[in-house]
Amino acid sequence: HHDVHVAYETSGNIAVGDEEVIRYCEYLRDVCEKYSPDSAVKDKANEIINYLRYEKVENGEPERKDVLFMKGTIRREEARHGCRYSGVKDDHVHFLDLPFYETGLVKKNDLSEVDKDIVKALLLEIKPDQMFVAGDLADPHGTHKVCLDAVLAAIDEVKDEEWMKNCRVWMYRGAWAEWEMDHIEMAVPI
């Protein structure tokens, strides 16, 4: 029996396209129209749809907070669905929303103590036997490296905990680059 937890360090909001937000907002608007026509949620959905369709200008400015919220919510529910499909219980799915990521731009902030402390708190709560972390440092946006640095900094602070003596950290790749053969310690065929 394995007690699996999945932690998402970032919201992934900027990876969600505007068309997806429009689609979900249209769905939300239509549901509100049917069941709660005077809803502020319906008004917000319409506002976001109109902004993305007619007003948004790509000028290097940070994304609007309400649009980022919708994008993050879409990504969060995709992740939650994937975890459920894989048999991970809802209360074992953790969305850390590390602050370094929340700039509304491709360029992110530097890792902070707050980011590290969020990861550390989760490690102390779960006390994992194994951790699987993205070791894909070829990520052109640098997000995977900052996330890995957050985990490694948190591990450094909890390394003397009793449960850490038997904890193993595994790094995986795939999204941006594969491992070189001489760097592979263990391969799992899937």
Regions picked out by a protein language model, each given a short descriptive name:
Residues 1-163:
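Active-site beta-strand->loop->alpha-helix modules in alpha/beta enzyme cores, enriched
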Residues 156-183:
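Short, flexible loop segments at boundaries between secondary-structure elements
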Residues 184-189:
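A short, structured beta-strand-centered segment in the mid-to-C-terminal lobe
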